[in-house]
Amino acid sequence: MTTFSFDAQVTSAHFDRSGAVFALGDGSVRFEDGVFDAVHEGAVLCATVHPSGEGLVTGGDDGRVIWSRKGEAGVLATVQGPGTGGWIDAIAASPQTKLIAFSSGKTLSVIDATDAGFRRDFQHERTVSGVAFDPGGRRIATSTYGGACLWFARIADQKPTKLVWAGSHTGVTFSPDGAFVVTTMQDMQLHGWRLKDSKNMRMGGYPSKIRAMAFLSKGSLLATSGAQGAVLWPFTGSNGPMGREASEIGFDDTTTVTLVAASNPHGRLAAGLGDGRVWVADPAGQGLNVVKAEKGAPIVALALSPDTTRVAWADEDGRAGVADVVID
């Protein structure tokens, strides 16, 4: 295990092709081997791995989108025009199409990592809270108040497909087969839509806000935080979780799962807890591998490597770590 102590809170943890990378609230990007870039004037608010797999693309409260590699950083885009908030709220990238999508206020923007001249800006009626690419990287889902919107990433003049459900939607993801869109909601539940007929799926019963969700096991399971264990929703078959109950793994009535991380199609799941512990498990197996047993401040950043052999985490006091995963 390798540990770190940062002077700022960690916004998010990731794995690029070189190892673990942390994005921090002081505007810096820190690589596992100690290399760091001070890139933003202010906090990093969101981050994702660059479509090439090298380094991070970060969005800051300075309104800039920056690609950070070891010892090198460059501005890819800035917020533009009316409807923006002056800072970057959410970001996503597609390795398949090399596109990067980010939101600022009511505006969704799309740029191409291989073409500096390409940009699309799409306007919403309300603030965009989350952004996700479909598996092929050709459509983008955004979460906002009142539901989700679907956009074609490269078409300039279009109207979105609206997926409507009352309430504040705070994050969004596609299922790995592209058949479903799922959002997290402010009122402690998930909502989903089957895209072929826009059929609604209500997925509730959570005791706290859901901050993370991740598909695993070839897309057959959706794991979420927000309960005393990691909640697992079944996504097998054409109906997904409709008419079916969720299960739970790692239940502990003394704490709450604050974050989950996975790397589809693998079956391993990582969970960060409100008491500072971190575990990794295979839902098809037995028991938990507690990779960080020491209790402390709540876990606020968590990532599992693409091959699920390593896990990275950070707590709200700036303490972070990277460890190998061993599951019997």
Residues covered by each model-derived region:
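WD40-repeat beta-propeller superdomains and closely related acidic/aromatic-rich repeat-like regions
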Residues: 1-328
